[in-house]
Amino acid sequence: TTAFHDYFGEGDRCALDTTYRFNQRIGEVANRFIQQNPAQMSKPLNSLTAGEKNAVTLLSDDQLDALLDKLSGYATPDDRILILARYHHLKPATLAKAATRWPKLNLDFMTVHASKGQQADYVIVLGLQDGQEGFPAPERESVMEQALLPQPEAFPDAEERRLLYVAMTRARKRVWLLFNKAQPSRFVEVLKRLDVPVARKP
């Protein structure tokens, strides 16, 4: 937190600036995305591997099956593939047949919140869409939510940006961000401006 001294008094800061999980390209995109918030502490990370330009890729959400087909052609049984969504009920129905359709793929599904502390070789983030079940989640509206949860930060979608940062940085090799073409998340435009490529096919 940038306000540590306000709550806990004086202290020293020791920067852990090397990551052994994700490659430099994933780190570059994730850091530039989250540090657009001026209140976010600047903490550039160095990686031991460079990563390719397409290590983070935007892809239409109707390409999930095609992506899993392609992954089954080169991912090894030891490669973990993590499929993440903002909400648990957004788990795709296609995963029910995954064991028979993609028997070689080591697939796990969980929410982004549950993925904290996890890592995988490949990560697929679902649900970059606008609306009630979107990512970023809509502003909380109920009086109960406003009373129980911390006050929102001044920078738009600050907490949701941190959540997408968590999702992206679970991956060692590649991340695909699947978006709804009809109702894309506003994060899609932000990511495009950070030179994240949009692929027509996996």
Predicted segments, located by residue:
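Conserved helicase C-terminal RecA-like lobe
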Residues: 77, 105-106, 115-181, 186-190, ...
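Conserved RecA-like helicase ATPase core segment
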Residues: 1-53, 199
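Acidic, metal-coordinating catalytic cores used for nucleic-acid/nucleotide bond scission
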Residues: 18-22, 85-91, 183
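Conserved catalytic network of the ASCE P-loop NTPase/AAA+ motor domain
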Residues: 6-8, 49-51, 101-102, 115-118, ...
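Short, aromatic/basic amphipathic alpha-helical patches
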Residues: 1-4, 91-102, 186-195
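Short acidic-hydrophobic, aromatic-tinged amphipathic segments that line or gate anion-handling sites
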Residues: 55-66, 200
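Conserved beta-strand scaffold positions in the cores of enzyme catalytic domains, especially
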Residues: 13-15, 56-58, 109
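Conserved helicase/translocase motor-coupling segment
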Residues: 62-129
